[in-house]
Amino acid sequence: MNTKVSRQYAKISENSIQKISLALATPEDVLEWSRGEVHRPETINYKTFKPERGGLFDELIFGPLVDYKCSVCGRKYRKSNENQLCIATKECKIRGSRILSKMARRYSMGHIALNAPILHFWFFKIDHSIIAKLLGLKVFEGNSKVPTTITKTAIENLIYYKSHIVLETGGLKSLEQNKIIDISEAGLIYKNALIEIIEFYPPGSEEHNALAESISELADVTSSKIGREYGVDYYELNEIIEEFSSARIATGALAIEYLLDKIDLRAEKAAVEAELAGVQKQIYKNKKIILKNQKRDKLYKRLQVINAFINSGQDPKMMIIRNLPVIPADLRPLVQLDGSRHSTSDCNELYRRIIIRNNRLKRWKAAHAPVIIIQNEMRMLQEAVDALIDNQKKSTNQVTTKEGRPLKSISDALTGKKGRFRQNLLGKRVDYSGRSVIVVGPKLKMHQAGLPRKMAAVLFEPWIIRNLIQEKKVGSIKMARKMIEEENPIIWPHVAKVIQNKPIILNRAPTLHRLSIQAFEPVLVRAKAIQLHPLVTAGFNADFDGDQMAVHIPISPEAIRETQELMFADKNILGPKDGEPIVNPSQDMVLGLYYLSQEKAGAKGEGSFFSTYEAMLKAYEFRSVELHARVVLPFEQVKPFIAKTMRGHLISTVGKFILNNIFPANFPFIFDDNVDELELNYPSQIKKYVLPYGTNFREYIQNLKVNEPLNKKAIAKIVRQIFDTYDGLLAKEDIATVIDQLDFGNYQNRVLLYEKLRDYKKQKLPVPHLSKLSEFTIFEYSQLYKQLQQNGPVESYRVLEDHEKAELLEKIWFKYNNMVCSILDKIKDLGFHYSTLSGTSIAISDIKMAPKKHEFIKDGENYINKLNTFYAKGLITDDERYVLAIAKWTQIKNDIQEDLNQSIKDDNQNSLVMMMKSGARGNISNFVQLAGMRGLMANNVKALKVDAENERVVRSIVEVPVKSSFLEGLTSFEFYSSTHGARKGLTDTALNTAKSGYLTRRLVDVAQNIVVVAEDCFSDFGFVVKDIIDTKTNTIIVPLLERIEGRFLNKDVYDSRGIKLASAGSMVDLQTAKKIVAAGIKKVEIRSILSCHIKNSVCKKCYGKDLATNRLVSIGEAVGIIAAQSIGEPGTQLTMRTFHTGGVANVEDITGGFTRLIELIDSHEHPWGKPAKISPYYGIITKISDLAEKNAANKGFLITIEYKTSKNEKAEHIIRIEQSQKLRVKVGDKVIPGQKLVEGPIILKELLAVSDARTLQNYLLKEIQRIYRMQGISISDKYIEIIIRQMLSKVQIIENGDSNFFIGSIVDISDYQEVNGQLISQNKNPAFGNVIVKGAKQIPLLSNSFLAAASYQETSKILVHSVISSQIDKLEGLKENIIVGHKIPAGTNSNYEPKSKFDIRNPLSFFMKNNR
């Protein structure tokens, strides 16, 4: 669709826009947009408050203030008269008054006809001046044979009338073409020109006399004090020169317009290309010519601008404004305040200045004022228009308010957080929404949220009004609205009715990842706070200390269905970051389950036998048996499914029988805290706890070891196994095929149809799923049968209506997908119930002092005294004394901790110990502060970059520890000492949160357009993975098992005996991964995102498993956004503190935190600390020698590497190492390119220069994983791979061959491959380039979409380059589609496969006759 969008843009549907292009607006375009000229600076009349005619708010130009009212005669019309002309009066006809709604004031534009040409500010100020690059003006100064390039500053002076330029020499030798005449040299230049001109005329002639007089006057002025200070009269001299010769000298936008008019773009292009070829030859001859490289880069930039104009076919003169558009009135409102005062948008003030100056210029011109006055007025007009376009970028003379605040210009309204892109296009305010404080809702089911009645009444108002009118409770909308406002009791039944099958979406800010927005079924509550299910709080990172959440309501049937199928809390059980459940019980629930699962030897009722589960419960209620007593039940009472094959009696505690009763009958029985792989360990456990008939139970139980109760980690493992067993395996369509074949006569015996179905892996359904599906189907059919019988008898052979089948399908589908959540709800209820019954409380007597504390403290004090003695004798330095003291106190605190651990080991009845051991709250570190010693405190000393580079000791820890515990009480000095650490902790957290949020934003912009778009890209280029090992500590950071699980293999995997363990092209599940690792295989080649062939996207096989669903990723999944969120969300947990490591600000401290992560992702060239030296060759370390120099500060080592050249000759390379750097190699070691020779961070560009992209990819992956794993955060490789792929997605061209690429230009790697493929197929010379690494800050700016790039940063620069090249945005990514109001090309709007999670068809469609 190539329709040009002009005044008729309102008629074009936004959904029909397929691509967007920018171009320079011509004066004719502006007139076409405009409804009239604004020629008066007034806004509104101070008496009537009505807009002034011809002013900035004129109703005739910008539209009426009142709907369908004539702005001339004031007559009112109906909506049907819209867009017609008012002909009520003669004046109406003359003025052409149009009948419009007041919405017209949001899109009707005006214009100001400028009385002088004005150069658009962006084109000479942004990105080193587009005008300067395009004109590329050069001048031959004097006798010089090398031309001088006119700088952008000189051109700016020209635009602002500070200097003049020679446009035509007229054959005068004293005037060089394009010479800028500055005030300092003007006198001499003009004098020489006039002397040259006078020779053309005979002496005594009128012209000769006039010129002689001018030369005499000029000589007098230049020699006078005034002339030296203020310069000559340019304008008079220009007129004389133009009158008596064909030379032409001018200034301002007129001069630029003349130059732009004369420029021959194609000739300029040829000249630049010829100059480039010459520079390139010189560079090839001598690679070290830096100045030539800089010259080449400047020429390329110029060529880029010239080509942009040639390819877009635009006239460069259009950069000059003749008609200035005036934006619609309601986009720059004027608001009335109290006391007849007004507040106005800054734009109005800027427009007012332009109109005043423009009108004044018009008057001066009409009055034939002196040229100098007119030129000054033109300069002021140029400055006024500049201020309107971009006031912030003006280096001087910014237009400010009385208070000195710079006015907000149109550019400022586009850029930044509060600009159009980020505030209004990417982040809009949403209708049908509200917010309130959250409180816990312990009685809610997992898919429910408590919505306050008052909020529901407002949010669902339109539906409630419809219901009230339909049921004749009110007669009009107005009455219904009043009833809702007054909270009339009549409305509440209707509120309850309308919220059925209407999900709500809850969002908690900051929205760090997709689990911060989830959907729920609303349950009305009478309070004013939203009730939240306790298990979903982890996803939202919410607590109940005053947190607020926003509520949103999906309205359309499609939105409701999408919300229910994709956003309900029961679909968000696994965290996308690592694929582990995020809904694990915590705090009270953990404490209750810990208490419930405790075992106690010799408890009341131990060894009792009960014939039924109910009998045991009754005995427990009558207190004849304790909760922790081990009792016996018949096996068939506990596990009837297994009892068919196994008989006997089962031993466990009353609590564990209660706990296991909530799990489905076919789930393994939980005996103890050994819950890893319950299915596999089940047979061995059953032998131990299932006794044959006739056994002496009491005697057997007395000899049985007491098991540990379930703690938080064990419960999390159980939740994972519940998910793996009961997560839905079928698609909705599969269940629909069964329902379609059932009727009331056969539904009980034909549920066997489920056995014929196959799950997403093409395997038979497991027994738990078959039994549950049968149970749900029989129950729902019987419920429907009873419901229909109420209206009369129902025949058994009656065929169900389509809508009845759809209703059944929805209910069965919900129950089937809710199996995991229903078990989790039971666990939650049990946890809360028994934490209450446990009676856990805290008393000061629960805190037991560390037995050997004082011995340890005494030992520490003696050690410190010795250190002080050594220091006083000069045996150690002050820094050494400090470091040793810190190390000693750290060790003492650890000793006290170990002592405390031993003392509380068997104290299971202590409430504090129970909380700690269960994982409900607190840990041993908190307990040490309570009962041992507080230990070392942080100081607010900041480690600087220079400290890291010089390995200085930074005293970021208070040397004297807090020896008291909280139980003993702190001394006043200790209390004061601990305040520093508390403040540092708070400030660090605040700073870290902001930095982490900015990191997430950058990452989202880097990867936003990466979506899974295909099944397979058929790449044969794999990625070899092995254990990621930290070479310094020799520990495994990420094991091979984690790296291959859920990924596709690129090659077959064989064990040492040659037996195939897994085939190429198959996905590695957990069992296969364990098999591969058990076989001792160290390296596996997998399919990777880093080698996927799909442009700007990824295929299913290169991505592998979707961690959030635990199955193969679906086409349409926005994996780029998920990757950015998964890396950014835990960013706040990454510590920025270095004090905990012992006070020395060395490289090791710095490399472990947030700072290093930013360095890697932004590809910093100057990282913290001394960068590591790396080997540039394959070779051997032959010598490491001391570097002895006179200056002691420069001591160090020389490492000699012996390597072979390309001619197979031996050569040596010597690398200098500073003494403070730690060596990682020794003589005789073999080294490879990119290998570290000393400790320190590697600079990414250096690594890429000596090795290849794959080495850099591995380094980045390892380093980023190391940073997160050091903090105990696990992130999947694939997310980091997506970001790394984007960082290495650009190629810098070094030879352009027969392509259209420029040497030195940066192009997308996929475009590079595509163009080269075409050239090779045509037997032409391909281009050659090097892969370059770009940081997260630069990648979004290099995007193919100017909308996405402009909404990120450097908006004006991106837009300027897009305009001059008429760049086309094909709307392929996510951001650009949101900006233009389209659905994003992902999820349910993508080309998803049938039966995938995005296939959310209307359930009726499965039963429609034409669908069969």
Curated annotation (Swiss-Prot):
Report one GO cellular component.
DNA-directed RNA polymerase complex
Q: How is the cofactor bound?
A: Binds 1 Mg(2+) ion per subunit. Binds 1 Zn(2+) ion per subunit; 2 are expected compared to other organisms.
Q: From the UniProt record, list the reaction(s) this protein catalyses.
A: RNA(n) + a ribonucleoside 5'-triphosphate = RNA(n+1) + diphosphate
Q: Where does Mg(2+) bind?
A: 543, 545, 547
**Keyword DNA-binding included in the entry's annotation:** no
GO molecular function of the protein, one example?
Answer: DNA-directed RNA polymerase activity
- EC no. given is 2.7.7.6
Report the record's Gene Ontology biological process terms.
Answer: DNA-templated transcription
Which terms are listed as keywords in the entry?
Answer: DNA-directed RNA polymerase, Magnesium, Metal-binding, Nucleotidyltransferase, Transcription, Transferase, Zinc
What cofactor requirement does the entry state?
Mg(2+); Zn(2+)
CDD domains according to UniProt: RNAP_beta'_C
The record lists Zn(2+) as bound by 1017, 1092, 1099, 1102
Source superkingdom: Bacteria
According to its UniProt entry, the function of this protein is described as: DNA-dependent RNA polymerase catalyzes the transcription of DNA into RNA using the four ribonucleoside triphosphates as substrates.
UniProt record similarity statement: Belongs to the RNA polymerase beta' chain family.
The subunit structure is: The RNAP catalytic core consists of 2 alpha, 1 beta, 1 beta' and 1 omega subunit. When a sigma factor is associated with the core the holoenzyme is formed, which can initiate transcription.
Q: What PANTHER family does UniProt report for this protein, alphabetically?
A: DNA-DIRECTED RNA POLYMERASE, DNA-DIRECTED RNA POLYMERASE SUBUNIT BETA
The protein's name: DNA-directed RNA polymerase subunit beta'
What organism is listed for this UniProt entry? Mesomycoplasma hyopneumoniae (strain 232)
Taxonomic placement: Bacteria, Bacillati, Mycoplasmatota, Mycoplasmoidales, Metamycoplasmataceae
